[in-house]
């Protein structure tokens, strides 16, 4: 299989370059930080954690109510996004039917003050 053209660009979401997962709706089964690992996910039969089957990706609990899962990723550096690879390899039967991507550019994130809403 031929790789998409955008894979020749720098991966702005690479943890080795400083990208970080900031927050997510739920990562009970598999941590959000796995989203930033390089390469395709792997599957290891028989490997389990105290929360269930070990998965090399981000996995939340199934929802019994409406809504969706989300994850905020701070890219390593500002840049132009030429493409996104949402790898659901090994998540057969437990993958989203669709996904959306939103982006914003915020300068000086260390100086942002979050007000408490009461």
Predicted features along the sequence, with ranges:
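Short beta-strands within extracellular/lumenal beta-sheet-rich domains
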Residues: 63-76
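Extracellular structured ligand-interaction cores
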Residues: 68-70, 81, 96-98
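Helix-boundary capping/turn motifs
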Residues: 50, 74-79
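Juxtadomain low-complexity/linker regions and immediately adjacent membrane-anchoring helices
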Residues: 1-65, 90-118
């Amino acid at each position: 299989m031929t790789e998409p053209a955008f894979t020749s660009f720098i991966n702005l979401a690479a943890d080795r370059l400083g990208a970080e997962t900031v927050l997510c709706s739920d990562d009970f089964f598999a941590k959000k930080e796995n989203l930033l690992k390089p390469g395709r996910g792997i599957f290891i039969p028989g490997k389990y954690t105290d929360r269930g089957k070990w998965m090399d990706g981000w996995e939340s609990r199934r929802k019994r109510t409406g809504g969706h899962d989300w994850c905020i990723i701070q890219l390593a550096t500002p840049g132009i996004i030429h493409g996104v690879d949402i790898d659901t390899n090994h998540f057969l039967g437990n993958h989203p039917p669709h996904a959306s991507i939103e982006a914003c550019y915020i300068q000086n994130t260390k100086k942002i003050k979050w007000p408490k809403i009461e």
